[in-house]
Design a protein with these regions (language model features):
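Actinobacteria-biased recognition of intrinsically disordered, low-complexity terminal regions
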Residues: 1-16, 281-283
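Extended, aromatic/histidine-rich regions of cofactor-dependent oxidoreductases associated
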Residues: 234-236, 242-283
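Surface-exposed beta-loop interaction hotspot
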Residues: 108-178, 185
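Forkhead-associated
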Residues: 48-100
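N-terminal beta-hairpin/loop module of FHA
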Residues: 30-59
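Protease-labile, long low-complexity intrinsically disordered regions enriched in Pro/Ser/Thr
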Residues: 78-124, 128
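Acidic/His-leaning functional-site neighborhoods
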Residues: 183-230, 240
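Broad, structure-driven detector of short, well-ordered beta-strand segments within folded domains
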Residues: 59-67, 109-116, 191-195
Length: 283
């Protein structure tokens, strides 16, 4: 791929429409982020063990037995779980949860996430009245610029590869299946970061850091979604839509960190910047 090819692409794009499309995308992304039970509403991160523990803001004592989360409700406590209204005194055992999966319970308006991350079973309450969510005023971004959009190619591995990466929480690791790499050119340099499977069939995402990380953008990671390659393996890599992961906003997230080859040596002055505040940090 040549620099001239990228310039031809830029010249063919209606810049005003490009900016409008980016603005509409950004507004919708912020709307999803501020959902009353989204990550900005998480009030704590709790790792379950055999030792029962009370969790602030939700009923019961919580523990782990044979890989299953258990909640022990006292007299007068109630919880909605597995389609049932549970009333104490009662012991409820949740089904086993697969890695990166989870189930939800409810206590009034508080949603209770029971999930498995990095081999650990965790509980995270999500309260729509949480102060951090109420005070959130948006994420700063770079202005959209076509110089940070490039055409690239997806190069599939012969077989998908399991890639182990670190996590925002010390001591955790995540294992993701990677179908291949995405190769593209930015400002005369070629990059081939490892890609992972996205939410939509055939789509991809890239975890990365760059020379702006820890300066104007979040230090640990950002993520870029990439639409499914076409029949010839072509993809569009648009860093204007690079976003923060939940760990940029809260200490109660277990987000994955980029593999070493995705630490890009160029400063990508595009996409979301470091959030203004972070939930759970000491003032």
């Amino acid at each position: 791929m040549s620099t001239s090819a990228s310039l031809v692409q830029d010249a063919s794009v209606d810049r005003a429409q490009f900016n409008r499309d980016w603005e509409a995308w950004h507004v919708e992304h912020e709307k999803r982020r501020t959902d009353g039970h989204g990550f900005l509403a998480v009030t704590s991160l709790n790792f379950l063990s055999e030792e029962p523990q009370a969790i602030e803001g939700i009923p019961g004592t919580w523990s782990l037995e044979d890989g299953q989360a258990i909640v022990d409700l006292a007299d007068g406590e109630t919880l909605e779980a597995d389609g049932l209204l549970l009333q104490g005194p009662r012991l409820h055992r949740f089904p086993c949860i697969a890695e990166r999966d989870g189930v939800n319970a409810r206590a009034g308006k508080v949603l209770i996430e029971i999930a498995k991350r990095g081999g650990f079973t965790i509980v995270r309450p999500r309260d729509p009245d949480y102060d951090y969510l109420a005070s959130y005023s948006g994420t700063p971004t770079y202005l959209p610029n076509l110089r940070w959009r490039a055409e690239g190619t997806f190069e599939a591995f012969d077989e998908p590869r399991d890639v182990t990466v670190g996590a925002a929480v010390e001591g955790l690791e995540h294992v993701y299946s990677s179908p291949g790499k995405v190769t593209f050119e930015l400002r005369g340099e070629q990059f081939s970061p490892t890609a992972f499977n996205g939410h939509e069939p055939g789509s991809l995402f890239v975890l990365f850091t760059d020379a702006t990380s820890g300066l104007t953008t979040y230090a640990a990671n950002r993520s870029l979604a990439i639409a499914a390659p076409d029949a010839d393996g072509r993809v569009t890599v648009d860093f204007n839509r690079a976003v923060n992961l939940p760990c940029a906003y809260t200490v109660f997230a277990t987000c994955p960190l980029p593999p070493a080859e995705n630490r890009l040596p160029v400063g990508i002055e595009a996409g979301e910047k470091t959030p203004l505040t972070k939930a759970g940090e000491a003032a």
